[in-house]
Amino acid sequence: MACNSTSLEAYTYLLLNTSNASDSGSTQLPAPLRISLAIVMLLMTVVGFLGNTVVCIIVYQRPAMRSAINLLLATLAFSDIMLSLCCMPFTAVTLITVRWHFGDHFCRLSATLYWFFVLEGVAILLIISVDRFLIIVQRQDKLNPRRAKVIIAVSWVLSFCIAGPSLTGWTLVEVPARAPQCVLGYTELPADRAYVVTLVVAVFFAPFGVMLCAYMCILNTVRKNAVRVHNQSDSLDLRQLTRAGLRRLQRQQQVSVDLSFKTKAFTTILILFVGFSLCWLPHSVYSLLSVFSQRFYCGSSFYATSTCVLWLSYLKSVFNPIVYCWRIKKFREACIELLPQTFQILPKVPERIRRRIQPSTVYVCNENQSAV
């Protein structure tokens, strides 16, 4: 372990601060708190798996929902599903037992899978953000389902290329019990540190910077468009009600409706971005400190800090389906349809009756309307 190696100074520091490094994890958090966190993490696993599975099922079963944006969202959901299944249960078990029961090789594999699926999820969120920027700011809607599939395939390959070196032993992966999960450990090797910096920049700092700039430009464009549409509507008078004036009025109304739809879609993506930032900023700082600061890595608070930041990073997998259910009406309807009949509180209203109750409802799913 990194805290037991390297130099006399590190050994002296370890004797003074962590007299039993291999068992330090068992003394950092009380047993009731560890068990509670593990139970909550298992619940997060179930909720994240079920919620993201619904997203994938909706896109798979309904051809009208296979637009470019929905394919991207389904890929994001799939990466969260794999993260929930491949990493979270083992972290929960380690939290309870304060021991890693799955071997050193699987420890390194689990750390690689963790970063791999996180990288893919971040890449998809970045692609969606750039697509929203091109549509709203540049007025270029170039992303079709075929191109989306190619971009998704490329993102999987790039994510594996970035996360893969940790599987081959490029950097130190620390086995619990110093942390509730196999994490990047302290190292003084320049190559290992360079890899960790590349990994953290690719996971958080670079996507965060690009998405932040994109959203600032989008907000500015939406604000200007809203002011222009409002001013044009206020300037109408009866003298403009000619044939040309009516056509211009119809175009303005279409712009207003399109602006409203794009603003709502952008708001949903913006909420996902905020959730990503809040969940991953602490983990990114923690990863850098673990590799560069021996005082932090060998300190008595490392286990508690690891538990908190890992728990927060997993929360993002649960956060996305909650946002979909809150913001997307079709997602809520699909959840109700997928529930077994015995668990449905309200009876399902047939489509013909829904048309009579709400005649204005348009049952058309084109590429734009089926997106979030």
Swiss-Prot record:
Expression sites (tissue/organ): Expressed in brain; detected in the basal forebrain, frontal cortex, and caudate, but not in thalamus, hippocampus, or putamen.
Gene3D superfamilies: Rhodopsin 7-helix transmembrane proteins
GO biological process, one term: G protein-coupled receptor signaling pathway
Sorted UniProt keywords: Cell membrane, G-protein coupled receptor, Glycoprotein, Membrane, Receptor, Transducer, Transmembrane, Transmembrane helix
Topological category with respect to the lipid bilayer: Multi-pass membrane protein
Residue spans, topological domain Extracellular: 1-38, 97-109, 171-198, 290-305
Gene Ontology MF term list: G protein-coupled receptor activity
PROSITE patterns linked to this entry: G_PROTEIN_RECEP_F1_2 (PS50262)
Main location: membrane
Family the UniProt entry places it in: Belongs to the G-protein coupled receptor 1 family.
Pfam families per record: 7tm_1
Record-linked PANTHER family: G-PROTEIN COUPLED RECEPTOR (PTHR24245), G-PROTEIN COUPLED RECEPTOR 45-RELATED (PTHR24245:SF4)
Lineage: Eukaryota, Metazoa, Chordata, Craniata, Vertebrata
Residue intervals on the Cytoplasmic side: 60-75, 131-149, 220-268, 327-372
Localization, UniProt: Cell membrane
InterPro entries linked: GPC_Orphan_Receptors, GPCR_Rhodpsn, GPCR_Rhodpsn_7TM
Protein role: Orphan receptor. May play a role in brain function.
Glycan-modified residues: N4, N17, N20
SUPFAM superfamilies on file: Family A G protein-coupled receptor-like
TM spans (from-to): 39-59, 76-96, 110-130, 150-170, 199-219, 269-289, 306-326
GO CC aspect terms: plasma membrane
Effect of S7C: In a breast cancer sample; somatic mutation
Record's protein name: Probable G-protein coupled receptor 45
Superkingdom to which the source organism belongs: Eukaryota
